């Protein structure tokens, strides 16, 4: 369910704003989106897994807060990230 190290490193390379960037909002949102997509698929198969459901809701809330921060501080980066990830905000 969690993103593998290899996949996480691929995401970091793809969304990093500079060399060694692992903490920018874009990277964090991209990794959370991958996690959310994996958990969503898990929940489709295991609908009674309430512990994973709570974790999914927490990750969605964290991503929402990061996106809100980016929207308030840099609208162009926000719009570019939403387009790259294909989110419906």
UniProtKB/Swiss-Prot annotation:
Pfam families per record: Ribosomal_S15
UniProtKB keywords: Ribonucleoprotein, Ribosomal protein, RNA-binding, rRNA-binding
GO CC annotations, alphabetized: cytosolic small ribosomal subunit
CDD domains associated with the record: Ribosomal_S15p_S13e (cd00353)
GO MF, one annotated term: structural constituent of ribosome
InterPro entries: Ribosomal_uS15 (IPR000589), Ribosomal_uS15_bac-type (IPR005290), uS15_NS1_RNA-bd_sf (IPR009068)
Record family assignment: Belongs to the universal ribosomal protein uS15 family.
Quaternary assembly: Part of the 30S ribosomal subunit. Forms a bridge to the 50S subunit in the 70S ribosome, contacting the 23S rRNA.
The protein's name in its UniProt record: Small ribosomal subunit protein uS15
Protein's organism: Lactobacillus delbrueckii subsp. bulgaricus (strain ATCC 11842 / DSM 20081 / BCRC 10696 / JCM 1002 / NBRC 13953 / NCIMB 11778 / NCTC 12712 / WDCM 00102 / Lb 14)
């Amino acid at each position: 369910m969690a993103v593998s190290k290899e996949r996480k490193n691929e995401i970091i390379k793809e969304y990093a704003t500079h060399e060694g960037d692992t903490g920018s909002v874009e990277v964090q949102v991209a990794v959370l989106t991958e996690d959310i997509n994996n958990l969503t698929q898990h929940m489709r198969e295991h609908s009674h897994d309430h512990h994973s459901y709570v974790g999914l809701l927490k990750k969605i809330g964290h991503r929402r807060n990061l996106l809100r921060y980016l929207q308030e501080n840099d609208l162009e980066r926000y719009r570019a990230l939403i387009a790259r990830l294909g989110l419906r905000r």
